[in-house]
């Protein structure tokens, strides 16, 4: 009887264990629905499993389009905290998503081509055109009034073709929303260019001409990240093919080329851009609303720098956001770089796939998207006061004309290559890039708040600059040292006790090292490790002084000095410490000289 009672529960436990294992295997094979919204607002659905990686979805959409130049594109999603992320191809989709299935994602342009002329296939140009059209509609592409009219006319020509009085009413542009602020003056200018300058252009040529104009604008390819600078002013950060850019109001206040950016890092809510030694402001710091927004900003910067800066993907290294002696987030861009993508595009030899275009009337982005997103979200306030009288007449103000192209000269419709010859060579364009503030419009850069990757909460950002704990520390430091008076005998007694304890500690440590006293092996190994560490420190410290102070031009010393980590240590830690020690020494010498 006793044996039967003992075996029964054991059998039940075994059955439960088998049931647990079978359910876990079943959960691994469970399919989850994933919906991807495309650039024309259509949707594609598929089913994935728990271990499916992000690369599967990217390949799935590229196969759906028959897209070969796929390295410019990526898939973006939003977590429950309204923070945007780019889907990482080498990680499991299930582990990246912080919400429950079914999942909804968006297929978007991740890296904007620096030169649209080098895009091989019409399909790729069409998808980039759809992305630029979205950027225009949501206010991310800031430009002058004349440029805005030309871009709008290219969109109308691509969507509707030539102008015919019998088919197009007098105010046919007003039926469609192309810009976030679309005035009657802008609509009249768009119709004028559409009627007179773009006649005869096919949709492919009109789209190509739009790309040629858009890629010359300062905000081309900018995915705006709102944050606060060191003074508390709101700024928009972005990454382009030229480098890291900062916009405030209607001006680009910073442009740091990728060759001048040594390192990008973040700590909590603070994002740092560390430049080379020749820069006036070697380190730029910005504050985001949340740590997740800061990490997303850092990842975007690392990926864009790797894509546009390096000549080969094999040159890309894993980067860390940490300081020198502390471990932080590590990340590596795993895709191709821009030069490799252009080289691969030049080798494409196939019959171009058919392009299925969707015009404005069939797209939801100009109707339902405006109602669902724009109205439900409060737009960011302009950073600089914009003239209210001109807002109704001029949606994008007459600013300083940007380089390269003149809108008054239409591109030749018969050949996009001939029209492209009007543009200056890329090398001359890069030589004209300046880092001084550049006025690009009379209106403040104010993209739609509903589509920003890192929403800004002004109250939360302002809390970064308010430290209540600072007041408590000041109160604690107000204690007077006058209450700590003691007589000379008490100090002498204390000194004798300290000397006695020191002698005992030295004798005890000597006995441990010689083996006269038995101690725990763990303690002994720790003490030996400590001694070895101190010995290494005594060796490394003179070597560090040799690197910092000596002018020896050995090859390995020069390589160490040029590393971003060493430059960061030199400017952020060593120089301030050196100045502080020098100041203290000068004070002591001055006091000795006076005495």
From Swiss-Prot:
It is found in: Membrane. PANTHER family: 4.1 G PROTEIN, FERM DOMAIN-CONTAINING PROTEIN 3. Its main location: membrane. Putative tumor suppressor gene that may be implicated in the origin and progression of lung cancer. One of its GO terms (cellular component) is membrane. GO terms for molecular function: cytoskeletal protein binding. This is FERM domain-containing protein 3. InterPro entries: Band_41_domain, Ez/rad/moesin-like, FA, FERM/acyl-CoA-bd_prot_sf, FERM_2, FERM_central, FERM_CS, FERM_domain. It comes from Mus musculus. Keywords: Membrane, Transmembrane, Transmembrane helix. It is a single-pass membrane protein. The chain crosses the membrane at residues 529-549. Residues 32-312 form the FERM domain.
